[in-house]
């Protein structure tokens, strides 16, 4: 039986992971749960899964939960979450905290040499090189949870790398696929949150609408699979059935396919190298009769270009990209920024940044902090 720690248990990935665990009580035991501030959800999870360890990032929320749950030590803040990330008795750490907040706990788990299911792509966007180096030192095992990276992981597992020519990551195209630039100038947050295929958290859904999420995934794939930027492509695939294509030097391809459901890559990460039965319904080929592919329009969705630029620039720039995007998306969701202005804010922040090489997490966080302040200044906060 695997002992599982879930960092970000009250979010979309965390809830899906607990659904998988609920279905296979003979295979998994919840050792620890960590959340930012969703006390009511976390309280219900504690009652059902009876973890030994719990951590809450937000001080006020932690104090509130301590009043409700008496028979359990509840750890507080980033320090508490990092303690869960390093638990010696944990068989796998599921890193599912959204945004830059997930970086330090993920890095601590890597330093400890843990097996980590990484759903927090921002960790690799911000500090991919550092995580890779630390992982080689500690012997940490990283299993991707993003559907596309899980797909690549499955396709290239046991494959000789020199035979791989290119990795293609697929994207549904989001709610504005096929639109002209002027048609999405004044879209509302509600329209942008209406994703046609995936049920996800708010930030990742907006990032999917701008294609920035796919840009982040390109950066993540670069570090996970040691592929240069020019060998990682993006295809719009509105059916979201094929999650990746791996192109080989002989002109052949391998694809990974399933109905779009995050429980599939989550279950694989939790159970690897085993597979669990009946996680998602099989594809109904009597209905799925057409699979489309398109090249993304980076004139309409220029955020994808910014991600490639940040990856090629290297150093502190990917961390700046992520931080500026996080601030801009938050401003859009709260009605302080138009949809097309998300790109403009990020571009201004990147243009103003003087790239520095990063050799520590502290330097990554300095770049992150600078970019947040600059983005807020550009927004007028």
Swiss-Prot record:
InterPro entries the UniProt entry points to: DXP_reductoisomerase (IPR003821), DXP_reductoisomerase_C (IPR013644), DXP_reductoisomerase_N (IPR013512), DXPR_C (IPR026877), DXPR_C_sf (IPR036169), NAD(P)-bd_dom_sf (IPR036291)
Residues that bind Mn(2+): 146, 148, 217
Top EC class for this record: oxidoreductase
SUPFAM superfamilies: 1-deoxy-D-xylulose-5-phosphate reductoisomerase, C-terminal domain (SSF69055), Glyceraldehyde-3-phosphate dehydrogenase-like, C-terminal domain (SSF55347), NAD(P)-binding Rossmann-fold domains (SSF51735)
Binding site for 1-deoxy-D-xylulose 5-phosphate: 121, 147-148, 172, 195, 208, 213-214, 217
UniProt-annotated binding residues for NADPH: 10-13, 120, 122, 201
EC number(s) on file: 1.1.1.267
One Pfam short name: DXP_redisom_C
Protein family according to the UniProt entry: Belongs to the DXR family.
Name of the protein: 1-deoxy-D-xylulose 5-phosphate reductoisomerase
